[in-house]
């Protein structure tokens, strides 16, 4: 534990992205996987103005920007085998761009069913399947699937393979494929349910491996544990759950931890916790960590055990507003963070900042702010109580 504490505490800002022409919240970050982490690569950032910005990972220079118009984009993910970058759109599509090219037009377009509004998605570890979660329309909240493989007779537009419609009763806010098993996927919804599916099974009912209940609207899910046989979940009202799927066929309870509001029970040294950002499973340590923060931009590292969340250490001096996204490359102790101050920061051990951008608090027009799903969303609570 001391090692990870020192690694995190020793992170310092190496670079900030240049001030964009249109300041936006930075809602999601992913890095390209086709080159070794230490040799640089690309960074894709989801912005609240409905675009994805592509940066050089080492310099944080903005290379190009892709627009999701006419829809708003939700989520950002690089392919595992190439530099294609994906995002789900409220216009009922999942869009795929070649991040190396400046073309505004998507390389591929995965079309949903009529009336689909996609708010979450993921691509499996082999880049074969895309799954997107939709907002509830009438009585249906769909998980939609596509074949994402390129062929010699490739079509730029793809229709769905099919959909699951029986396992969620409200908006599907999160989708995450297993890191190494291409057939396993977990989904989370505003109905509070977190469902695990095995896509190698033919029908939806039999494919459902487990249903876990967070009792609140799901904001983040992920895989963890040895062989990634555990899942964790965060909620829009700052709850945290952790389940062990190894115990599905035993008498042992699958719930490892269930905290209704982490802000009430987590003691942060010389500070406080306002919200959760996401989770990180450290394979070498076999330990799950949770990243949280404050409304003034301080970042907290929390360790997760079956007794609760405990504060390890914190980073400060980088952001001036709520931090909304991060991407931590454990192999090189490299951290990327993005926030509501429109800043993209690269942190590395013992770094000395090579560029400087004034980090004033960002004031964003209310029309944009209303489109962005923030953490403590009363609308989710009201919808759930209805």
From Swiss-Prot:
The keyword Iron-sulfur does not apply. It comes from the Eukaryota. The keyword Repeat applies. InterPro entries: WD40/YVTN_repeat-like_dom_sf, WD40_repeat_dom_sf, WD40_rpt, WDR89. Keywords: Repeat, WD repeat. WD repeats lie at residues 21-65, 68-107, 112-156, 167-207, 213-253, 318-357. GO terms for biological process: corpus callosum development; ventricular system development. Pfam families: WD40. Coiled coil: none annotated. Transmembrane segments: none annotated. This is WD repeat-containing protein 89. It comes from Rattus norvegicus. The lineage of its organism: Eukaryota, Metazoa, Chordata, Craniata, Vertebrata.
């Amino acid at each position: 534990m001391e090692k990870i504490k020192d690694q995190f505490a020793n992170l310092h800002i190496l670079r900030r992205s240049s001030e964009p022409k249109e300041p936006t919240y930075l809602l999601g970050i992913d890095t390209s996987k086709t080159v070794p982490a230490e040799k640089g690569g690309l960074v894709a950032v989801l912005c609240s103005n409905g675009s994805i910005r592509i940066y050089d990972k080492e310099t944080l220079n903005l290379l190009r920007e892709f627009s999701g118009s006419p829809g708003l984009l939700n989520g950002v993910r690089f392919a595992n085998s190439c530099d294609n970058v994906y995002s789900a759109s409220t216009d009922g599509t999942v869009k795929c761009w070649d991040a190396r090219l400046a073309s505004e037009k998507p390389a591929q377009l995965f079309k949903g069913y009529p009336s689909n509004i996609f708010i979450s998605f993921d691509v499996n570890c082999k880049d074969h399947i895309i799954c997107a979660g939709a907002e509830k329309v009438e009585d249906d909240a769909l998980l939609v699937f596509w074949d994402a493989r390129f062929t010699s007779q490739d079509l730029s537009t793809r229709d769905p393979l099919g959909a699951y419609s029986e396992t969620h009763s409200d908006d599907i806010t999160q989708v995450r494929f297993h890191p190494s098993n291409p057939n396993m996927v977990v989904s989370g919804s505003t109905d509070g349910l977190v469902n695990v599916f095995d896509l190698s099974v033919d029908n939806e009912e039999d494919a459902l491996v487990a249903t876990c209940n967070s009792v609140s609207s799901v904001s983040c899910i992920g895989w963890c544990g040895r062989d990634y046989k555990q899942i964790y979940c965060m909620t829009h009202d700052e709850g945290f759950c952790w389940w062990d799927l190894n115990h599905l066929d035993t008498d042992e309870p699958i719930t490892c931890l269930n905290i209704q509001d982490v802000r009430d029970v987590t003691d942060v040294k010389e500070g406080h916790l306002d919200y959760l950002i996401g989770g990180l499973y450290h394979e070498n340590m076999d330990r799950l960590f949770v990243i949280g923060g404050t409304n003034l931009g301080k970042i907290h590292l929390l360790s997760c055990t079956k007794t609760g969340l405990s504060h390890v250490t914190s980073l400060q001096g980088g952001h001036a507003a709520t931090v909304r996204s991060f991407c931590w490359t454990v192999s090189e102790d490299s951290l990327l963070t993005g926030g509501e101050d429109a800043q993209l920061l690269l942190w590395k051990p013992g770094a000395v900042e090579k560029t400087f951008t004034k980090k004033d608090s960002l004031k964003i027009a209310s029309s944009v702010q209303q489109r962005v799903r923030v953490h403590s969303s009363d609308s989710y609570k009201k919808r759930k109580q209805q």
